[in-house]
């Protein structure tokens, strides 16, 4: 009788351990996590990346940990977030490096820890990552230069509202812009170029206003990202004349900038696809974890849009996650 009781107790214990094991296995599967770290969290541009990442996570049953610094120049904070996610043993990291040099050790640490890292939006000076998914930013700068060259008929004085140095994406845009003007439109002169410090829309407004005040007879302006485009547009409105309008080309889709394009307050915008960066970045990590091949570099596309293309279904789809 006693033996029968002990056999029963033993069987119950084994069943309990098996059940706990199954629960733990289920918990592990449910807790698959991918960290997504933008350059900053204040710009609406990064909302597109977040939405794309969340959609991919939902489809693959992965949790998305979204965290980033409040402003893009806070490299130390971004590095700390990468370190924290490594300690959390996330399954992978999607990272938009705020500085192509400063983030190198953090990216290489993910590689050393065998945590797949997909770099999005902006490059980093190492190859110790799974994949790089971004706009061809040099091409974006080329498109902006060609547009401003066209609307100014190859002659005039222009301003450039630049961005924080060592941001690989904006550095490439500005390089493409300047080199294309020099080669294809030698009659156009960049008479002034400044970047906002700190990198806020208010400061972008101030530096644009200062340049417009210092330089008379300006014909055009290029703002190289969403923050500078928003600040430049608000400053520009106070300097426009009915008989001579300063032609502005912006980059990225801030709601007020898209509204300005619709009203004719600026000439055109260069658009990226941040949703695709977030979506494909997460998907690439999951494919890698399944043993599938992942391309080392992916071009996520770039578009020039003018007022007449704003309501094109393709453009509206592109804007949906950004405004």
Labelled PLM ranges:
Residues 100-139, 157, 163, 254-262, ...:
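Flexible loop/hinge segments that line or gate small-molecule binding clefts
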Residues 6-10, 168-169, 180-182, 187, ...:
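Hinge/cleft segment of the Venus flytrap/periplasmic-binding protein
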Residues 35-37, 89-97, 116-120, 159-162, ...:
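Periplasmic-binding protein-like
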Residues 35-52, 56, 65-84, 88, ...:
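Extracytoplasmic "Venus flytrap"
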Residues 57-71, 158-160, 183-200:
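Short beta-strand elements in bilobed, periplasmic/extracellular small-molecule ligand-binding domains
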Residues 86, 94-111, 177, 197-259:
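Hydrophobic alpha-helical
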Residues 45-62, 140-144, 168-188, 203-207, ...:
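Short, solvent-exposed amphipathic alpha-helices that sit
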Residues 78, 133-158, 172, 202-205, ...:
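Hydrophobic alpha-helical segments within soluble ligand-binding/sensing domains
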């Amino acid at each position: 009788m006693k033996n029968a009781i002990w056999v029963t107790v033993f069987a119950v214990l084994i069943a309990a351990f098996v059940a706990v094991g199954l629960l733990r296995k289920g918990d592990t599967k449910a807790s698959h996590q991918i960290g997504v770290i933008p350059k900053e969290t204040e710009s609406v541009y990064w909302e597109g990346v977040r939405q794309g990442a969340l959609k991919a996570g939902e489809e693959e049953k992965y949790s998305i940990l979204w965290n980033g610094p409040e402003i893009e120049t806070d490299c130390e904070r971004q590095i700390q977030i990468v370190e924290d996610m490594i300690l959390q043993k996330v399954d992978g990291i999607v990272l938009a490096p705020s500085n192509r040099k400063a983030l190198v050790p953090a990216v290489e640490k993910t590689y050393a820890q065998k945590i797949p890292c997909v770099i999005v939006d902006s490059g980093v000076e190492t190859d110790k990552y799974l994949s790089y998914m971004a706009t061809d930013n040099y091409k974006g700068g080329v498109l902006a230069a060609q547009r401003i060259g066209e609307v100014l008929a190859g002659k005039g004085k222009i301003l450039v509202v630049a961005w924080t140095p060592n941001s690989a994406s904006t550095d490439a845009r500005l390089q493409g812009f300047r080199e294309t003007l020099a080669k294809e439109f030698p009659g156009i002169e960049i008479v002034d170029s400044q970047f906002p410090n700190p990198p806020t829309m208010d400061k972008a407004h101030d530096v644009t206003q200062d340049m417009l005040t210092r330089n008379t007879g300006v014909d055009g302006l290029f703002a190289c990202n969403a923050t500078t485009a928003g600040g430049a547009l608000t400053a520009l409105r106070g300097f426009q004349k009915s008989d001579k309008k300063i032609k502005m080309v912006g980059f990225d889709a801030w709601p007020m900038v898209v509204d300005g394009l619709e009203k004719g307050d600026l000439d055109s915008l260069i658009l990226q696809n941040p949703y695709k960066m977030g979506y494909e970045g997460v998907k690439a990590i999951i494919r890698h974890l399944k043993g599938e091949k992942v391309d080392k570099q992916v071009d996520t596309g770039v578009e020039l849009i003018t007022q007449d293309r704003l309501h094109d279904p393709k453009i509206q789809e592109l804007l949906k996650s950004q405004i």
